[in-house]
């Protein structure tokens, strides 16, 4: 068991091209600290009003999104050299699910990506900000990419 304060690390990824960079940072930190690392991706669906036939295609699309997300998360874990690491895909509100999983798994540190913001994008409530304020543990925001001016 690790003597460091971080024994369980939750890596939260959006499965964009930045996920590998964030994953490497979390993987290296976990290895250095002797901590467990778990990967999480949350699929957030746009609510659909039930209107007969339109509901069934929406449900099939959601199921397909979950299947693809699981495949991509499994591939990311393998690319990081962590094929045996626990990884899960949840559906729902990203902030709520990240906080719920962190509590449920008694995580000591959440690692996620943070993008530089400019212009109007500064006013939007971003996931890393909301997780930071609601998390039951420390949060490490890994700086990635650059947001488009705007």
Regions found by a protein language model. Give the residues of each.
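Intrinsically disordered or low-complexity boundary/linker segments at protein termini
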Residues: 1-21, 109, 133-150
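Structural beta-alpha unit
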Residues: 1-4, 78-110, 117, 147-150
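Small/aliphatic-rich secondary-structure junction motif
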Residues: 2-55
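General small-molecule cofactor/ligand-binding pocket signal
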Residues: 38-40, 86-90, 140
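Short secondary-structure boundary segments
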Residues: 41, 113-115, 143-144
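Short, hinge-like loop/turn segments at secondary-structure boundaries
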Residues: 54-58, 104-105, 128-130
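A short acidic, glycine-rich active-site loop
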Residues: 57-71
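Glycine-rich, Arg-bearing micro-motifs that act as flexible, cationic patches
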Residues: 109-133, 148-149
